[in-house]
């Protein structure tokens, strides 16, 4: 069974992307089948995984808008894991998906139903609580929340934990 982990925090610069790439690489070196999903419009996880954005036919942006399938979007990295790449245009998905209907938050979860051959799916989230992050939280069964060792970071962590709990309650309930 695939384990889906969202690496998330509403704050930027806390190590989400670095954690996601390093975890994907370590799991890949252990022989696990890993899919890294880059949901951040900055696309740092894509670039950091060695993927040339210029040569991409599709990205997670087109997949979320159902213009292509998950399989058409996945690219293999030289680091031993697959990548669902991002691009700057992904910021547009926030506009195109937000406010449409509640199903917009389930698009990633639905797409991942075809990714059962992976041992792990790791989702690098943007530093915001938006439709992209909500898609990750809905799709994930576990969460890694990197935080800085400071008071305000812990306050933000409590808020994020509450958001995750409410999302899971609405999915299961």
Where are these regions (language model features)?
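P-loop NTP-binding core
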Residues: 1-173
